[in-house]
Amino acid sequence: MHKTLSSLAIIPDGNRRYAQKNNIAVEQAYLAGFRKSEEAVRWCGDSGIKTLTYWALSLDNFSKRSTDELSLLFKLMKSHAQRVLDSQAYKDNEVTVRFFGKRELLPAELNRMFSKVEEMYPERNGGLSLNMGIAYSGRDELLNAAQKLAADISSQKVRANSLTESEFEKYLYLRESPDLLIRTGDSHRLSGMMPWQTVYSELFFSPKLWPEVTKADFEEAVAFYDSTDRKFGK
């Protein structure tokens, strides 16, 4: 049981490069990435981590990926959602699943499946909470929060001059701040992942492409977190 690392976020980068590196179809690489996400859920459960936030699809993907690639991703997401619905391990371990982001951009059938998953695995005490970022952008999250806040100020539900950070966080998709954020694929940036919540998160950048990550790599990241002296601005 891991006693200090409670909340983990992952940016699983490198699926397409994995396809190029191994001379396989992009679909096979994405499928390997989805399977790796299932392993990550098990690793977190085995380590006593309470929350895993996983950025599955960025908002930028909708404008920068081809229609064919997006269709492929949606197909694989649907298949993955069905695997989660059928997973006895998720039920036995009382996993909670939540999707966040601009879900209205997704195909209706896929959105319905995500809603079924959320209904199957509602919030509960004791198990792992899995947050899946779909059509997510940190800038969009802040903009969405600001728009909702402005509406509440306009209707006098909120007083602007007495607004606190805690009250603002109610307008975000997620309030919890990750203790540790892992990004794979050897890119040393967050690319807009939870900009408000990661202010004091420890950051671990792995050169491994996401499908290549092993439990030993995961444990290396946890050990890195254990070695840090968190200051929280002090």
Protein language model features and the residues they cover:
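Flexible, compositionally biased loop and terminal segments
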Residues: 1-234
